[in-house]
Amino acid sequence: MESLLENPVRAVLYLKELTAIVQNQQSLIHTQRQRIDELERRLDELSAENRSLWEHQQLLQAQPPPGLVPPPSAPLPAPAATAPAATAAQEPLQDHGQLIPATPEPPLQHHGQLLAQPQPAPSSRVQTPQSPHQHPVAPGAVADKEKERPSSCCAAAGALLQHASPAALGKGVLSRRPKNETVLHQFCCPATDTEQKPACSDLASQSDGSCAQAGGGMEDSVVAAVAAGRPSAHAPKAQAPELQQEEERPGAVGSPRAGPLRAASPGQQQPALATALCSHTPAASEYELSLDLKNKQIEMLEHKYGGHLVSRRAACTIQTAFRQYQLSKNFEKIRNSLLESRLPRRISLRKVRAPTAESLVAEKALLESCGLLGLPLGRSPSLPPTFAGSLTELEDSFTEQVQSLAKSIDDALSTWSLKTMCSLQESGAYQLHQALHPSAGQPGLETEAAREPDSGPGSGDEAGSLPQGHSGTLMMAFRDVTVQIANQNISVSSSTALSVANCLGAQTAQATAEPAAVQTEQGDAATQEVSEVPASELMDPPVEDSEAAESGAQSAHEPTVAEAVVEEAVATEAEEEEEGAGQAGKGAEAEVGDNSEQLSSSSASTKSAKSGSEVSAAASKEALQAVILSLPRYHCENPASCRSPTLSTDTLRKRLYRIGLNLFNINPDKGIQFLISRGFIPDTPIGVAHFLLQRKGLSRQMIGEFLGNSKKQFNRDVLDCVVDEMDFSNMELDEALRKFQAHIRVQGEAQKVERLIEAFSQRYCMCNPEVVQQFHNPDTIFILAFAIILLNTDMYSPNIKPDRKMMLEDFIRNLRGVDDGADIPRELVVGIYERIQQKELKSNEDHVTYVTKVEKSIVGMKTVLSMPHRRLVCCSRLFEVTDVNKLQKQAAHQREVFLFNDLLVILKLCPKKKSSFTYTFCKAVGLLGMRFHLFENEYYSHGITLATPLSGSEKKQVLHFCALGSDEMQKFVEDLKESIAEVTELEQIRIEWELERQQGTKTLSARSAGAQGDPQSKQGSPTAKREAMAGEKATESSGEVSIHNRLQTFQHSPKLGVERGAPAPSPPTSPPPPLPPDPQPSPLREQPPPLPLPPPTPPGTLVQCQQIVKVIVLDKPCLARMEPLLSQALSCYASSSSDSCGSTPLRGPGSPVKVIHQPPLPPPPPPYNHPHQFCPPGSLLLRRRYSSGSRSLV
């Protein structure tokens, strides 16, 4: 499992997956080429079969009556008309995968006549009149022309055999139907063209020249209605005699109109007529029939399909079915698009399996049982998509899958949070087992590193209870979702597996209660394909506009500096809220519960909307939330509060995000904890680092406070990730520091500043190793960076007088001898001083910058506005009303109301001639506890009353305002209402946290009071001894004694041993006794011979040190030389510090314990041991600076 945690191994797995996808595509292309060759061979066979049938019908056909024989000049179409007929004969079989029910023998004879008329006589045995322009064509020539004809012609001739029966197509085609019934024309006629474009009927077979634009669609729809069980079974019976009668009398109807056309070139007029009348050609828009001709055409079609009533009824049935089909299809598209837009990034659930004999038989049985044997098999939402349909979509999505894998590889090669996976591994109870089912003829993606052995005998049962639609969904528990192509069943072998199995078991029971047709469809669900979301749609989900953005529009008045600041601040706040609200949708790692809901609903969206799918989606959502909420969290202190906020509205999400930003700007640790618990940011150091660098609304000062806190390991990891995101290559030291300080304000306590500068210097050394080689010690970079910060503060601080500021010579003199006694090159120091003098080192603008600009434009301001948590919301021009029942002049009481997130500041404009300030301060009212209501009377149409409690009393301050228009008042009220709700909820959270802190303090004080009893009153009692031991153990556990900052001392104390009646110890020169068993190994562990009678001491006893002693790491030869000196120094130190070691209770036999409680020393900040710490290769660089400021040998 540890190999999974390696970033290169993860990248290799992604590359293997990408290779498998490429091989998949190559195999699919090879399969398509084979099927194209198969189609061409079938076309040749069908043309030969049609020709033999035509000859057979010509032999059986009686000689037509003399009056109905067409004149010798009657043209016949070109011999190439056979190809569309053959192609269309293949299309109903292979493109649609269905057969039309067989009809009696008269339609068979009619079909023979229909095929016989447009084709010339290939043999001399058939005695039919021919025109001088026509020549007999051999079957081989026709077959050659079929091969030369492009494949795009098959769609244009798709309706030549629409009304032909299967019996006329030969028995050879019927025997091959189960093998190729789902084959699509991949390159000549896609499924969309076959589904949406009605084909033209054979114009060349009818001498009347009328187009079958409506007739073709009518014929297709009649066939569909017959296959669907509609009450139109009389249509073939009525249609066949009419068509047979019309074909036996070809010149009776169309001779009046077709006569002038035949006077021209007979080989070109009929194709031209077909082009003019067919609506699928561009010529249809250039030539339109007159109203009389259209009416006559409709009348002829009605007569052709059995009369007016029969054709009207059939047309109504067809139109109703088609409209219902279009509505359901559009609704399915809309639902799929909405679900796809909510899916997280980098998720591509792709399940493809090659068709087997069982799947084809099941599909055929489904079609026969549902009565859908005659419908064109398009991509209808009620039918399961087949493998042939997935070929085209796999080709379209291949580029998206490659891009998704590229992003996954980039994420794996970047700084990866190993601690999440480590906690997942150490918990031991969360193991996911993947059972990859081999697919027929298609290589599945096998991820060896993700496989683990079954943890129990119940894994197989649980795997069987999981449906296939949720196999990729449970992968969200790994926080790293890749493209899944092969079918997978994942069983959860953890404590939550029982709840998952129960939820999904209920779903399975619900699925078994559905009808047989639905069971068959679900049984064939392995061939279904979940729709994939393009990366472009996933990157930018739609986010509603913020309320603050709506309130950005202000009333038209003279522009001022503060108003421009307000507009800029409001626009920035709108961007912050949109980023915060949309971040939970973008960050797939944070809102796994929401994503599980979307994935389960999207997997069920390919089926029809039924109650079973809704129940399954709800059950899967609960099961997945149970799995993911039980996973160990990295930084979430309370896992019960880390639930996905999927039920909250968009307004509540934005409010919670702003509350999280306010908490961060007040207390960074609490703010990060709140944002992680609400799912806005991931609980990994790299996720928090990206949040601090990219999101707006965070105070630069508080970012520095958070990153400079070296007491928490999580903060140190985040700082490492932050500096790793910055590139300082080929940059001067001051310019790199300027880039670093643009994101993080380096100020505050010296320890935090030192921590930030140390991390910066380490990163700069990594990016510029050639610069570091110029110095004798890499610590020179740290010293020089610190000197630049001091120079910038000295040069631009307003508290330092100009005559006392640091000059260039002072700066050079202060840096003398810092490079291990050597001076830094003068030109380097001069360049740094000049660049700092030209431009100040300062952070980028944040929300506090706008508040500061407003504060500087106000005169008489007593309240401090510039606070890290204060944010400007909007500014409105209102008019203060002293008495709501009296009319007053509005111009005399004009007020500029600035609404902050926790404060309402009321100002009035200053005269420009009298003062350089813009505003004069009037009032500042807090929003906590504020109530407001709108009023309207005969004097003021748009009024508002604000009531705020006064501090220290029960009275309330009441203010009345009115606005000129309703729009401005409405926007102000909306912002005010949201700000009051925000500050109220923030206060509730603060009170809850304060109560928790006080309860924790009371618990600790009670424990300490019980442990630190009166030592004089309980000096010799056993209870005092037990309490002293308990207090000592608690101190050890709370102090976190480490080998890096505490010295492991020995159990030797001569003075205490004599006082307590212990045996006399050996002389001071003798080595001390051995250490008690300690779980932490010490590098300086010595093994001298033990004393004869050592006193019994508790195993965790330590001697408190009064100063921090560095641990010196030596190699074996040096350790052998230093061993006598170290033992002598330790023994001397033990004898000299025995008085100060009395704080540790060492008990002798039969003597009372003298307990002197002293607080333990606080541990110093640990050394900066980053994985990418720069270690120079030179032999001269033998010293390194640690975070505590001291140096030690390496």
UniProtKB/Swiss-Prot annotation:
Annotated compartments: Cytoplasm; Postsynaptic density
Entry keyword set: Coiled coil, Cytoplasm, Phosphoprotein, Synapse
Domain SEC7: 646-839
Gene Ontology BP terms: actin cytoskeleton organization; activation of GTPase activity; postsynapse organization; regulation of ARF protein signal transduction; regulation of small GTPase mediated signal transduction
Expressed in which tissues: Expressed in brain. Localized to dendrites, as well as somas of neuronal cells.
SMART domains reported for this sequence: Sec7
Extent of Basic and acidic residues compositional bias: 1024-1035
Pfam family, any one: IQ_SEC7_PH
Biased composition (Pro residues): 63-78, 1064-1099, 1159-1169
Biased composition regions of type Low complexity, renumbered to the chain: 79-92, 561-572, 600-610
GO MF entries: guanyl-nucleotide exchange factor activity
Function: Acts as a guanine nucleotide exchange factor (GEF) for ARF1.
SUPFAM superfamilies in the cross-refs: PH domain-like (SSF50729), Sec7 domain (SSF48425)
Modified residues (Phosphoserine): S255
Gene for this chain: Iqsec3
Coiled coil (residue ranges): 20-56
Superkingdom, natural source: Eukaryota
Skewed-composition ranges (Polar residues): 122-133, 1036-1052
Protein name per the record: IQ motif and SEC7 domain-containing protein 3
GO annotation, cellular component aspect: cytoplasm; GABA-ergic synapse; glycinergic synapse; inhibitory synapse; postsynaptic density; postsynaptic membrane; postsynaptic specialization of symmetric synapse
InterPro entries in the cross-refs: IQSEC_PH, PH-like_dom_sf, Sec7_C_sf, Sec7_dom, Sec7_dom_sf
Annotated ranges, domain IQ: 311-340
Segments for region (Disordered): 62-149, 229-272, 439-471, 515-610, 1002-1099, 1137-1175
